[in-house]
Amino acid sequence: MKRWFKYVKPYLPYFIIGPLCMIVEVLGEVIMPKFLAGIIDNGVQNRDIGQIVFMTAMMIVTALLMMAGGVGGSYFGAKASVNFAADLRRDVYRKVQDFSFANIDRFSTGSLVTRLTNDVTQMQNFINMLLRMALRAPGMLIGGLIMAILLRPSLALILLVMLPLLLICMTICIRKGFPLFNKMQEKIDALNSNVRESVTNVRVIKSFVREDFEKKKFGRSNANLKQAGMNAMKLMIFLQPIMMFFMYTTTLLVVWFGGNTVIAGNMQLGDLTAFITYITQILISLMMVSMLFVMSSRAMASSRRISEVLDEKIDLNDDNAAHTDLQVKEGRVEFRHVDFRYYKNSEDKVLDDITFTIEPGQTVGIIGSTGCGKSTLVSMIPRLYDVDAGEVLIDGVNVKDYSLYHLREGVGMVLQKNVLFAGSIKENLLWGDENATDEMIRNAASHAQADGFIQSFNNGYDYDLGQGGTNVSGGQKQRLCIARALLKRPKILILDDSTSAVDTATEARIREAFRTELKDSTKIIIAQRISSVMEADEIIVMNEGRITGIGHHDELLKNNKEYQEIYYSQMDKKEATA
């Protein structure tokens, strides 16, 4: 509760005023039957028009006050719940933004989206309902019960028999509800993950003619969610008829015994009418409570899932950084006996005893078979992952001693998977330097061999890339990402297979731009093609998570078996022997 009070406190007036407004509505509901009884007993039976008009006027005034209270309660309840949800959603989003890659790996993307949207909405709806019903339902129950007892204690005994039976049924339903709603949220996770994956990769699906497979896959996820939803909704389907059964049974018993009492002359007809109204109010208030508890079961499941995100321990932080103001100045990179596993309990190392040094301004290529750990290795430099053993140093300082902000400001990465965001080309390039001028942007794009195709678009640099950059080709995406990195002008630039979708001539011009524009920056190039790294100052050869060779192209071609295999598999034999 302490956690959630943090989100209640800023809007405490709304949380207080809303229920107080509902009290006005409850008082009106309790008083109304007495006015109705007065109209019947004192007005209709005595044929007193004045009494009827007076009581009717009182009922109208009371109804207006009830309406004002109801509107006020709904308004302040909505204000409180919407603000609560907005602040909670903001904090969950900020927490996710602080996640390391390892943290994100523990949650699926679809699950995080569900928790940010659906789960927060469930809590918002529950709070809105709670503020409207928390005082109204108990107020109607207690007020109706008191008035019923005051009117006719003997008839009120009927409630003492029916209420315990009703409460037992409600308790059973609520206890069964929590695991069912929790299961339902998990199925929503699975469905969201399925939808996100299929929509994101729709081009691949169409190119492999897998639409039918994906439709069936979605159908299974949708059917699972439907079944989970039906299982949860069975509570409502079961609970509502029970409530109605008890309501009608209680009303019939009251009408039977009360009618006999009226016929015997021991009770007035107006009082019986008021008593029946109070009984109805009591049972309706119990229905409200049951609805509230059913919603609370779903909200509790959602709150647990949100708490899992908020309680997730961030694997990477700079709380223990020794030099929080230190910035990357030279770009010297050193690995000392680094080991790494993606899963701490795994026996297989992704990186095994990695040791090397890159001097400032050097261009170093990293090459090796697919899955040998190249991308994982460079992820250690900006601390996207932390090492299990050994240490990574930049300018002689352990990366853990830098603040994450200053460390990552000094490192630029063009990832293997090129990522662009919805918006214009200019907006995407400004990620590299938000203060860059138009001239700087165009210069970076020109060196990345992107200015030509950008100018061919109708709006040039204001051309809308679409969601995820879907309006440009793979090669154009790569060049835009390179331009973004050039604009950042980092001390360490990491290129993770970033020119795989461009031709060799364009790649050569991009490499030349790196040499001239970033001559003082350390450049690390991961590549599948030897032509991409053969002119590097040094080349690191990797195989199965280990370094098998470090040296120049000619040196490795003579002495390193893995490098020879890659080279001869890519080069024409005549060219290789020339």
Regions found by a protein language model. Give the residues of each.
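An intracellular "coupling" helix at the cytosolic face of ABC transporter transmembrane type-1 domains
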Residues: P10, D98-A102, N118-I127, L131, ...
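ABC-type nucleotide-binding domain
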Residues: L326-A578
